Amino acid sequence: MARTTPLERVRNIGIAAHIDAGKTTTTERILFYSGVVHKIGEVHEGNTVTDWMVQERERGITITAAAITTAWTKRDPQNPTQPMPGALEHKINIIDTPGHVDFTIEVERSMRVLDGVIAVFCSVGGVQPQSETVWRQANRYSVPRIVFVNKMDRTGANFYRVYDQIRDRLRANAVPIQLPIGAEDTLRGLIDLVRMRAYLYKNDIGTDIEETEIPADMQEQADEFRTKLVEAVAEADDVLMEKYLEGEDLTEEEIRAGLRQGTIAGTIVPMLCGSAFKNKGVQLLLDAVIDYLPAPTEVPAIQGTLPDGTEVERKADDAQPLAGLAFKIMSDPYGRLTFVRVYSGILKKGSYVLNSTKGKKERISRLIVLKADDRIEVDELRAGDLGAALGLKDTFTGDTLCDDSAPVILESLFIPEPVISVAVEPKTKQDMEKLSKALQSLSEEDPTFRVSVDPETNQTVIAGMGELHLEILVDRMLREFNVGANVGAPQVAYRETVRKPVRTEGKFIRQSGGKGQYGHVVIELEPGDPGSGFEFVSKIVGGVVPKEYIGPAEQGMKEACESGILAGYPVIDLKVTMVDGSFHEVDSSEMAFKIAGSMAIKDAVMKANPVLLEPMMKVEVEVPEDFLGSVMGDLISRRGQIEGQTATEGIAKVTAKVPLERMFGYATDIRSNTQGRGIFSMEFSHYEEVPRNVAEAIIAKNKGNA
């Protein structure tokens, strides 16, 4: 089957932002104007296309990254409600990502497979902590982006304040290509700084737009920002810079070409504005997606590794060997959906592919593309396409799918560690079986959701990125899998580490008639770098310990560290060097060395000044200034460290680092402390040593439970 849309006319984009910036509404309007839906969905009515899970519709937030395919033809500048004569249709694959920090993995995995992003900002709230997180994720994968300043109809809307915040807080070269005409309830149109024309909206559904002169009272401001736009474009291109310095005007085509070049290179971030809810600015936003965001052929070719370790790249080309990345798993009435971004080659229905990450062959039974709740079966996915495959049993998030004849492994995803856990217990024997199925299915879908069994209590423990994350997963267990379960109170994911180097040994000898047991290791332990986990090095020479016993000794140490030594929490950031030992020709065994390794590490950790670490959260609180004192006092009482405060138009913003252990239930507390007028956001920052008095209480409690 031939390609229906040339690669140059494909856009793979994400819509990302902080919670409540209006991403889902923006997506709904895009689907409405591009003809995917014929009735506008509203978040507050719970009938949007991309929020299709029950939990999403109830809470009015997006949890999973919904993938949708649509099409757009550029509008006629003289009549923006109609396609431009002679313009060609573009295919747009859109991922609507969640803004709540507990669902960061959804943003992370969508950034990995996108070519461009629309970053949506609220014109009132501006740059929020989650905006910074999303921006960092886009930076990590060098994703070009355009900005849409939304909610310009809201009280307190200020386009220019958001412009300053993006430049100052995100250190981005934001370049407005539009200015709003009016704001709040007087928002009536937009100025196009590329064409230097105005668009006035004559109705509230965006179907009657008049192209006209720039209002006289805004001409000076428009000229000022037009100059900034031309300067930014000239800086992105030497030829345009030369023309600009010689005093010549740049044409519309040159400005667009320079903006495109700068956006794709990451040196320019075009800024647009409007109100998705009031249907203003959406068609022009879609035009900007086509004008400024890259096609799959315009981003760097995906990097991969061959089986022999050689670095290789795969270009976006149907003729190249197949290379695709599984970026999401989802349970569905259709079966297990594996979302795939095809980077090169063609993925065909009914074909066998190699999962090079696992070294296993898989059969693609069916392929579908999604329009949220609608699943459309297709015969193939080509280079640059996003879609979902059915029939894959061993493929998980981050795995590479490729041709068996041309194996390659693509770079996987960055997956953050969970910071909060709860114990779950099935209510009945029947629930026990259902619970294990539910947990397996949910952990396949979400790599930040971890399941383990506490060896002391035999309880099943689930861990995730925050209270809301676990709350929604437990809710899904009850609703989708019909599991009756009792859920314990949230527990903090503490860690243990060491502060000084030591040398010690572990010797396991058992003689009780017949074959004995003998294992002996000598180790040096030292603190590792933050984030280094458990590092093991063997410096055994001369066969003092045979090679076949070094692995089991390491395994014994690793398992002891995973179980915890000081208070039962995993030991991290330490380097262990095995320097000596001894063995017995007859009595030594792998098990004896595993036990000796475990004994050595336990002794070493207890002698190396062990400490407890706790997750610290970056907390940002916004409250009316009248409540500032009580909110700051409350944060300090939670062992918080205040890092900064600002005030704008009667609203105070406080940033602090606070231990996660002291933030449980904070959502309820801040509501009662501020008469329901305070809001806060929280994300994981780093691990920090627990104060001695607090640590002693935690250790004593854990030893009492043992």
UniProtKB/Swiss-Prot annotation:
Give an example GO molecular function.
translation elongation factor activity
Q: Name one Pfam family in it.
A: GTP_EFTU_D2
Query: Keywords, A to Z?
Result: Cytoplasm, Elongation factor, GTP-binding, Nucleotide-binding, Protein biosynthesis
Q: What is its main location?
A: cytoplasm
Chain sites annotated for binding GTP: 17-24, 96-100, 150-153
UniProt cross-references to PROSITE patterns, sorted A to Z: G_TR_1 (PS00301), G_TR_2 (PS51722)
GO-annotated biological processes:
ribosome disassembly
Name the InterPro entries for this protein: EFG_II, EFG_III, EFG_III/V, EFG_IV, EFG_V, EFG_V-like, EFTu-like_2, G_TR_CS
Task: Please give the GO cellular component terms listed in this UniProt entry.
Answer: cytoplasm
Query: Which parts of the sequence belong to the tr-type G domain?
Result: 8-297
What the record says about family reads: Belongs to the TRAFAC class translation factor GTPase superfamily. Classic translation factor GTPase family. EF-G/EF-2 subfamily.
Job of this protein? Catalyzes the GTP-dependent ribosomal translocation step during translation elongation. During this step, the ribosome changes from the pre-translocational (PRE) to the post-translocational (POST) state as the newly formed A-site-bound peptidyl-tRNA and P-site-bound deacylated tRNA move to the P and E sites, respectively. Catalyzes the coordinated movement of the two tRNA molecules, the mRNA and conformational changes in the ribosome.
List the NCBIfam families: EF-G, PRK12740.1-3, PRK12740.1-5, small_GTP
**Designated name of the protein:** Elongation factor G
